[in-house]
Regions:
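Conserved, structured C-terminal
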Residues: 1-256
Length: 256
């Protein structure tokens, strides 16, 4: 990620004596498995009690002879796991998963499919919904802030936003009335001829069969049911704000 160098520069400039830091990003490799039978697959490959790993839990597990760190996370809204291992083990791990997954009908899917499915869950991603240019209050990430924690970078500014009038824009999910093209990012959002926001990312949701987008819109308009206009490939399209997570709104599948 482009943020790695930015963070490493800050760490290097602010290290205290006798403290060392090393970026291990190139030493590890990750993949994810998703679907209602992913737990069965993982359980068959390890002797540990990974079946008891709770949603959002993480731990160290051996898959065969491969040491891994597994998190029970889901970007696509299904029961799933994210698995990380050393770079030298990734080919063996991939082969092991594909071979043992045949009995469950396993197959690989691409990055665009992942992006489509995460839109159906209203899951934002770095460099689109989340950047240094957007505040936690704008994107909803303020729910993860521990306000009782000692001073940290951005605490004062974030607290002033929280205790004041709030952010001037908020992240929302849109359903776009378009059958031939989808939003991709940075398209303007209009209301009564006035620009009131912009798209952060978009695509087609194949499970819900709708053109979807996420975007930042003026706070006074950021309510479900609000009708707006979006320019896609130079053409004005009707759109409306919808409740988050149009696919499996209660998140029952990924918590299965």
């Amino acid at each position: 990620y482009y943020l790695r160098n930015w963070h490493m520069r800050w760490f290097s400039e602010n290290l205290t004596p006798h403290v060392f830091i090393r970026d291990l990003g190139e030493d590890y490799w990750g993949l994810s498995i998703s679907g209602p039978r992913s737990k069965e697959l993982i359980r068959n490959l390890t002797d540990s009690e990974i079946g008891k790993l709770p949603f959002m839990g993480c731990g160290n597990y051996d898959i065969g002879l491969i040491q891994t760190k597994i998190g029970r996370l889901s970007v696509v809204g299904e029961l799933g796991y994210e698995i990380n291992c050393r770079m030298g083990d990734h080919i063996a791990l991939r082969r092991l998963l594909l071979e043992n997954g045949k009995q469950f009908g396993i197959h690989e899917y691409g990055f665009n499919a992942l992006l489509s499915m995460r839109l159906e869950k209203s899951f934002g991603i770095w460099s689109a919904e989340y950047t240094q240019g957007y505040t936690p209050g704008m994107t909803g990430l303020d729910r993860w802030i521990n306000w009782q924690k000692n001073d940290f970078i951005g605490k004062k500014a974030s607290y002033l936003e929280k205790s004041g009038n709030g952010p001037n824009q908020k992240l929302v999910t849109l359903e776009v009335d378009s059958s031939d093209s989808d939003a991709s990012g940075f398209e303007p959002i209009w209301k009564n001829g006035k620009r009131v926001g912009f798209i952060t990312s978009g695509g087609y949701g194949h499970r819900v069969e709708k053109s979807l987008a996420m975007g930042l819109i003026n706070t006074d308009l950021a309510e479900s049911g609000q009708e707006i206009d979006v320019h896609i490939v130079g053409k004005e399209k009707k759109a409306k704000i919808i409740p988050v997570s149009p696919y499996d709104p209660k998140g029952e599948l990924m918590r299965a």
